[in-house]
Amino acid sequence: MSLLHIAVILPLIFALIIPILYRFFKRIHLGWFVLPVPIVIFIYMLTLIKTTMSGNTVMKTLNWMPHFGMNFDLYLDGLGLLFSLLISGIGSLVVLYSIGYLSKSEQLGNFYCYLLLFMGAMLGVVLSDNVIILYLFWELTSFSSFLLISFWRERQASIYGAQKSLIITVFGGLSLLGGIILLAIPTQSFSIQYMIQHASEIQNSPFFIFAMILIMIGAFTKSAQFPFYIWLPDAMEAPTPVSAYLHSATMVKAGLYLIARMTPIFAASQGWIWTVTLVGLITLFWASLNATKQQDLKGILAFSTVSQLGMIMAMLGIGAISYHYQGDDSKIYAAAFTAAIFHLINHATFKGALFMITGAVDHSTGTRDVKKLGGLLTIMPISFTITVITALSMAGVPPFNGFLSKESFLETTFTASKANLFSVDTLGYLFPIIGIVGSVFTFVYSIKFIMHIFFGQYKPEQLPKKAHEVSILMLLSPAILATLVIVFGLFPGILTNSIIEPATSSINHTVIDDVEFHMFHGLTPAFLSTLVIYILGILLIVTFSYWVKLLQRQPGKLTFNYWYNRSANVIPNYSEKMTNSYVTDYSRNNLVIIFGALILLTFVTVFSVPFNINFKDVSPIRIFEVCIVILLLSAAFLILFAKSRLFSIIMLSAVGYAVSVLFIFFKAPDLALTQFVVESISTALFLLCFYHLPNLNRYNEKRSFQLTNALIAGGVGLSVIIIGLIAYGNRHFESISKFYQEHVYDLAHGKNMVNVILVDFRGMDTLFESSVLGIAGLAVYTMIKLRKKRQTQGNEVKNHE
């Protein structure tokens, strides 16, 4: 096992260990035991920067099911390293922050178990080269995030938000599964790198469009893109460390990673470029507009996260245009990938810090309601400083890193508007317009975020708690992120050669020469647009109280949340009605539906599919076999007219013993002996149990019931006979019996073929059958124990009375 595999598995192992440690170390905050895990992974990832800078990659394989092409294959390139650094780096700061945020009285064992589970799953997503393994980790992120969002399960809003996120992201996960299966069909491989190398085969496949649509749905749901964004605001009910981790740097970025990783395969399609770009721009505009009207600090950050994700998504879509050009023209559009990667990093820094400050404000004042907050500038000066730095970065104000990536975004929209590709030159003007409008509202909600908390009148009478500056443990992590905001803004070269260029090259192998970010490029369209954004933003802030009321009057039926809630209520009701229409309290009705469907499917298949019934290889029927079958049928027939349970049991046993005799004649003595033992034990058990039951009562049935029963029974019998004859006479595959005959001794070291098949070749099947019997036995034992317990309690009550 390689170090790369250990880096992925380490959080998963500690996720199992941490709850045990929690039982023995109650006095020490559990976060201190968790903190070394992401730090160690982060340090290890830093050592791999030189590898990716030199253009090399790391490929490690751990065999799992090689025959099916499912191995634990890990592939690390510039893109995987970038996300791994974000996952482990931000994860370290979040764990440190959580030590100050969560008290020891919380269920810390559960919290850190879920957090580490999520961390390992995210590392698995961004490092897996096998798409099936990627999917497994992808779904594990949905499951672990569900547990984290519902951590405070006593709150109804937490349960609602967790269920909502799970439903939408799992829907996307199923779409992703369908997409990757369609990708694997033409390439006959589950390797992502192999798919990229054979992208032309996928592009010529009839499944190409369907795979593209399904994978985009998977990415859009995970990264909260329009119209799937509705789960993210409700997920804010999670503890603030969860919001800072999942919803700024990791989970919501998984969809962006998937789009970036799959771009070499799908960039040849105009549908990919248009859809990814327009969905991103629409998300940017819609979410930034909605962020301005939120009354909850986390609500503002939730919609701002959605809008920033839309911005990055749009840049990834624009960058895909580079696949349709050569040389310098290709590099011009590939610069959008560079801008996307840079903003990916910047967003993790300023948004992570803002979430942590929001948690600090909530921890200090007891509320996140902007109507109750205000005037905290002098009370929380350190928090104010961090907020100003990070919020201005989000607004795109120099000299912070957000300004550089926002300028790059605007530049890419103007570049895309000039692309003479797929009629982009006629509609491309929408790109910069939507980008500018979205950036205006981004500026507005960023500045208002500062004003809501720290300016205005201080209202202590409306605060549940007396406001105060929080502890150093809660300030250290956002302070580090705020420092990075300044450093990356003033010295972006720290990232360009080491992180950004290798990550960009992983998306498009076009060489990006001398990537540079500057505060001022001259009077470019992007710079002039920035001035327009500032002017319009200030005007909207000044008139905020007038126009925001119009947004808050949005009819409920025009929101996606309304239709989600309506569907969540209507679908279960219709499902229940449909289920009740064919699943009733009468077992006979249920059996009629089941057996009727079997008969219908059998005869439809018989009359629609050509087949042969071949009796050439059928062995001759001997007289004693006929006698045994007659005995068997007679016993089964007499059960129908039995007037006592004892007679029914005897006839049923006769059927079983008759089958055992057939096994003897067919030279299967062990099987016959087993059948004899089972029948004997079953008969004894039936007799013991039925002894305690009341007498058997027979009810006269209507002739219509009797006729229906006879038709169903006859139809099922005929169907089974037909299926058996067709299966015997139409062997499209070579019989496996020869394999057993040839290998029963050398592989299993047994001479009895039946025993070897049951115990060795089909050992798992036998094991699970035994497990089912064991579970049934436990259920019976539990029922008996409960009955005895109730009888004992009843006797105690009587004695007390």
Curated annotation (Swiss-Prot):
One of its GO terms (biological process) is sodium ion transport. Keywords: Antiport, Cell membrane, Hydrogen ion transport, Ion transport, Membrane, Sodium, Sodium transport, Transmembrane, Transmembrane helix, Transport. One of its GO terms (molecular function) is antiporter activity. This is Na(+)/H(+) antiporter subunit A1. Mnh complex is a Na(+)/H(+) antiporter involved in Na(+) excretion. It is a multi-pass membrane protein. NCBIfam families: 2a6301s01, PRK12645.1. Signal peptide: none annotated. The chain crosses the membrane at residues 4-25, 30-49, 79-101, 108-127, 131-153, 166-188, 208-230, 243-265, 270-289, 302-324, 339-361, 373-395, 429-451, 472-494, 526-548, 589-611, 621-641, 646-668, 672-694, 707-729, 767-784. May form a heterooligomeric complex that consists of seven subunits: mnhA1, mnhB1, mnhC1, mnhD1, mnhE1, mnhF1 and mnhG1. Disulfide bonds: none annotated. It is found in: Cell membrane. InterPro entries: CPA3_Na-H_Antiporter_A, MrpA/MnhA1/PhaAB, MrpA_C/MbhD, MrpA_C/MbhE, ND/Mrp_TM, Proton_antipo_N. One of its GO terms (cellular component) is plasma membrane. Belongs to the CPA3 antiporters (TC 2.A.63) subunit A family. It holds the Pfam family Proton_antipo_M. Na(+) extrusion is completely inhibited by the H(+) conductor carbonyl cyanide m-chlorophenylhydrazone (CCCP). PANTHER family: NA(+)/H(+) ANTIPORTER SUBUNIT, NA(+)_H(+) ANTIPORTER SUBUNIT A.
